[in-house]
């Protein structure tokens, strides 16, 4: 199987920005955002998760295309496409591919002290577990000293959840949470373009590792 016969359906959660920079221009406002007391972030201390998700996903798309993979975005640049619609798009694209996966990019939110990276699959043992492990191992290698939040209770590093993006498609699917934007230190990393590129490259390398194990020819 050639890389261009392997399809990645790429998802970025939540909405983007309409023309402007204020919070009222953020499609998902007042959800999926926070205003930190200091620092500029996206605008006057505001961090907008959907904007971050799109930036990281765009870098990931380019690295995957550089490997020769097919990539189909299932999100819009600005609008917050419904979960059902995004799953339907992924399913439609997958029908024409020899092999397909779904990767959903997110930032996390919790208490101000929560930090780090984690990745989710649907419950049970599936190929999604291997995909999550391949990506997770690359992210952990690429970010020494950062907080990693694996769950090895079932002998792999992913966590399990019944998120729509994971259960609404038949293909292997993972959802990565790339830092807590509610934590000031994590948000400072997440807004940095070089850090986004590092995380995106790690995702791409992990996807390549998985694809090779599924029969993709790579030198």
What are these regions (language model features)?
Residues 2-7, 44-219:
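Active-site-proximal helix/loop segments of hydrolytic enzymes
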Residues 7, 12-56:
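Active-site-proximal loop motif in hydrolases
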